[in-house]
């Protein structure tokens, strides 16, 4: 349990994938998944909610890569099927920063991506 009494899981990934072209993609991620609701109703997974925080780094053998940082916890409602809030900054190497914003809590498939001050809405 964390300091707030919530169950949490540390998730670490360190892997490499080889594409059919022979190029490799390396991925390293360190995340914390905090169970914010539904932990006492083990037979009803649809009332579960999680906050996810952390970082990720991806690199390509042909050059380039990216880093990702959760700047506001990504909130998942299992019964919804989509992230409902949270912000991630994705910094591709030699490219502008991308800010992904999942909104303010509404269960919908809408999110925005901001690049160079331009915001694009996806749903």
Per-region residue spans from a language model:
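An extracellular/secretory-lumen and virion-surface interaction module
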Residues: 20-24, 85, 117-122
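Extended terminal
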Residues: 91-123
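Short helix-loop boundary/capping segments
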Residues: 1-77
């Amino acid at each position: 349990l964390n300091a707030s009494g919530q169950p949490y899981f540390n998730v670490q990934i360190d892997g490499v994938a080889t594409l059919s072209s022979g190029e490799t993609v390396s991925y390293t991620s360190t995340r914390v998944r905090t169970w914010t609701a539904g932990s006492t109703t083990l037979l009803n997974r649809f009332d579960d909610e999680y906050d996810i925080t952390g970082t990720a780094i991806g690199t390509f053998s042909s050059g380039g890569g990216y880093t990702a940082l959760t700047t506001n916890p990504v909130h998942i409602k299992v019964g919804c099927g989509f992230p409902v809030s949270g912000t991630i900054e994705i910094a591709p190497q030699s490219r502008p920063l991308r800010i992904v914003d999942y909104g303010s809590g509404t269960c919908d498939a809408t999110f925005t991506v901001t690049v160079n001050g331009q915001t694009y809405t996806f749903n």
